[in-house]
Swiss-Prot record:
It comes from Carboxydothermus hydrogenoformans (strain ATCC BAA-161 / DSM 6008 / Z-2901). Pfam families: Metalloenzyme. GO terms for biological process: 2-deoxyribose 1-phosphate catabolic process; 5-phosphoribose 1-diphosphate biosynthetic process; metabolic compound salvage; nucleotide metabolic process. The gene is deoB. This is Phosphopentomutase. One of its GO terms (molecular function) is phosphopentomutase activity. PANTHER family: PHOSPHOPENTOMUTASE. It is found in: Cytoplasm. Keywords: Cytoplasm, Isomerase, Manganese, Metal-binding. SUPFAM superfamilies: Alkaline phosphatase-like, DeoB insert domain-like. HAMAP family: Phosphopentomut (MF_00740).
Amino acid sequence: MKRVVLIVLDSVGIGELPDAHLYGDEGSNTLANTAKKVGGFELPNLEKLGLGKIHPILGLKGDIKALGAYGKMGEKSPGKDTTTGHWEICGLILEKPFPVYPNGFPEDLIKRFEEAIGRKTLGNKPASGTAIIEELGEEHMRTGYPIVYTSADSVFQIAAHEEVIPLEELYKMCKIARGLLTGEHAVGRVIARPFTGTPGNFKRTANRHDYSLEPTGKTVLDKLVEQGYEVLGVGKIYDIFAGRGLTWHESTKNNEDGLVKTVNLLYKDFTGLLFTNLVDFDMVYGHRNNAEGYYEALKQFDSYLPKIMEKLREDDLLIITADHGCDPTTPSTDHSREYVPLLVYGHSIKEDVNLGTRETFADVAATLEEIFGLEPGIGQSFWGEIRK
C-alpha cells in the first residue's frame, strides 16, 4: 500500500451500542432512523460499497455484491464525542471518560477564567449552540461578555459575536481556557464558536476553532510520522489531535470544501495517510435535528465518492467510517452512543467481504499498522481478511 485515504463522516452512526441506555441513547440509529424519516435513501455509491449490507436502511439494497469490504465497529472507550472517537480510530482507547458538566462549570473555575481574560462571562450551562446565542446574544453585544456553555459532551465552548470580540481575541480566550482546563477538569475540547448577525437573526460562522487535549498516548499518526510517512490532515483533524502526528494540514469551510480538497490531494504523489473529517453531518444537521439536511449532506458525499474512487491508484486504499452518532430524529440534540459503519475499497482488495462487528474502532489503526509495517498496538487488523 502506498496511500490510504481515511474519511470520517462525523456522527454518521449505524445503531445503538449495547450500553447506549447508560448514555440515554436507546433506539438511536443515525442512518436507519434518518432514512425512515425522509422516506428512504438514494445513495447509489455508498450502496455499491455495501452500506445497506451492514444494517437494514430504507432505500438501500442489502442483497448486492459489495465492491469492497463492509462491517461495523463498536467503541471500547467510554464516551460518545469527537475526540474519543477519533483517538480510538487511531489506536488510543480511553480508560475513563472526559469530564462533563451537566450543571455548568464550577464557580471557582469560571472566576479564574474571568480573571485571566479580564471580563465577566454569560451562560455557564449546557445548551444548544444556536439556542444560547439567541438567548444571550443581545446581552453579549451590550456587555461584551463572552458566552460560556457546554453540552452533553466534554466541551468548554466560548461564543462571541465577531464584531464584539474579534476572532484573534476569541482564539486567545480559548487558549487561556485550555491552559486552565487540566487535571480533573481536563475537558476533551475547548471550542471557539464565533457568530455574526443581529438579535433574532444570529448565525454561527465557519471560523470555529477547536483546542483539543494532546493525545494521552502514541497514536498511529505518531507512528507513521516517526517512520517517515506523510500524514495529511483535512478538516478538524489538526484540532482533534492538537497538531500531533501530522506532516501537513488544511482546515475546511464545509463538507464540500473538504471533499474538493481530498480529491485534489489525490493528484499528489505521497506515501502515507490522507485523513479527512467531514463535520457538517454533525455540526450543521445532527445537533439541529435536521434529518432532511442530514440526508442532503449524505447525498452530497455520495456524489463525490466516484471522484475519490477513480483517483485511487492500484496500491491505494479507501476507508470510510464515523466517530459516533448524532441521530437527528430523536428529541436529544446531542451525540448518540452508536456503532459506526466501516466501508473499505481498493483495487487490491477482495470484493464483498463481510468484516462483521468489530470490537473497537482501533481495528482501523491496527490495519494501518500492518499495511505500513509499524509497531502493532491494540485492535485487530482486518488487512489479512481483505487483501487479494
